[in-house]
Amino acid sequence: MFSYDNADMKFSDGERIHFIDRKGRQYPLTLCGGKVFQFSGEKISHDDIIGQEDGTTVTLSRGSKFIVLKPTLSEYILKMPRGAQVIYPKDIGTIIICGDIYPAARVVEAGIGSGALTMALLRAVGERGVVISYEVRDDFSKRAQENIQIYNGKTNNLIIREQDIYNGIGEEGVDRVILDLPEPWRVVPHAVQSLREGGIFLCYLPTILQVSTVVRALKESGSFIQIETSETLVRTWHVEDNSVRPDHRMVAHTGFITTARKVAV
């Protein structure tokens, strides 16, 4: 399992790792004692990797060298098995900052999907915080828990409720309500009851018509101020010697993020 609490950062049995070849290509692998990694007619035992330091170079049976790295959370999210469409790292970063997710926060989330956002929330709230995730689909819940287990290991600050958040939120005095749902406006009345004063409501939506509907619901509730909507566009650059230019492809629109602060009325 992967954990930054592991000071020596050595690879362990059951951990997800990335092989990086000389061209920078990544090959994900889950370590399992006794198994063998094979690549283009070459091989190396998983046992020869377990116990090695993060960032080490290993040599396969015919001499090819690979760098072995623990995946970052962003890399893991993009490679992990998916039961549902994930929120991409560029949007997760915006959610963590605009949602002001902090250590020891109590966060209600719906739905859990494949667990991408959940893992970032768990990291942000830390061991003293808690993430309560509402998810009606059992297959999504199971897939997310598997993904979280592989990357985070045993997690004590996650509570999964297989309930429909459209019918209500059982928690009171929570710090944040984070929604990745088709109709978040149906949750606004429940969020009013669940959020503490000063708490933040945040939702992630793919279309601007959905955004318009949820913003109207937030305003009509009379309980929210500072209602803002944004989207995050990311463009990488090619920088090589004297050749400096934007990459030909960029990650443009994926979704809109709407935030609002709850106040006493």
Descriptions of predicted regions:
Residues S114-E127, Q193:
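Conserved SAM-binding loop of SAM-dependent methyltransferases across substrates and taxa
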Residues Y134-P184:
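S-adenosyl-L-methionine
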Residues I101, R123-V130, E197, F224:
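Conserved S-adenosyl-L-methionine
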Residues Y102-G113:
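Conserved class I S-adenosyl-L-methionine
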Residues V188-F256:
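C-terminal substrate-binding/active-site "lid" region of AdoMet-derived donor-dependent transferases
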Residues M1-K70:
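N-terminal auxiliary segments of SAM/dcSAM-dependent transferases
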Residues A7-M9, K79-I92:
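Conserved SAM-binding loop and adjacent beta-strand
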Residues I97-Y102, A124, N152, I169, ...:
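Glycine-rich helix-loop-beta junction characteristic of Rossmann-like nucleotide cofactor-binding loops
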